[in-house]
């Protein structure tokens, strides 16, 4: 399981160093094979171990092509998907198109989300968190959740 928030500097080539605490799990789960795509609702990237991505991709591909929402999701998630290999130094090269989509500069934030990571520009992540704190706490539907 991937959890936690890690600020990371991209190098001049646009490579992201996977935090050390995740490297063994990534090796065990997917032999360093990852898939990067864009989030269809936010200006962030989604990074999946290959087996988890295969499950997501199959679900998205099973949606009806006649649905406008399904086509949009297919275009965003599958159309922007890139296969990436973690190199021997634990780095991933983030393609330029993905960096542009997510407004990456030098500083990014890697956010563990269970079976995947979200990767945000640090400034967009900070703005998102400020917006969360400013929102009213509408927890309808989550009454039984124990935190």
Language-model features: where?
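Positively charged
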Residues: 12, 54-58, 71, 75
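A positional/architectural concept
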Residues: 3-16, 20-40
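Short, charged/polar surface micro-motifs in flexible loops or helix N-caps
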Residues: 41-44, 51-55
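Short, Lys/Arg-rich amphipathic alpha-helical interaction segments
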Residues: 123-147
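Short, structured motif recognition centered on aromatic/hydrophobic residues
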Residues: 14-18, 90-94, 117-119
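Short, solvent-exposed interaction modules
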Residues: 61-92, 98-99
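A short beta-strand-loop micro-motif that forms or neighbors metal/cofactor-
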Residues: 28-44, 103-120, 124, 136
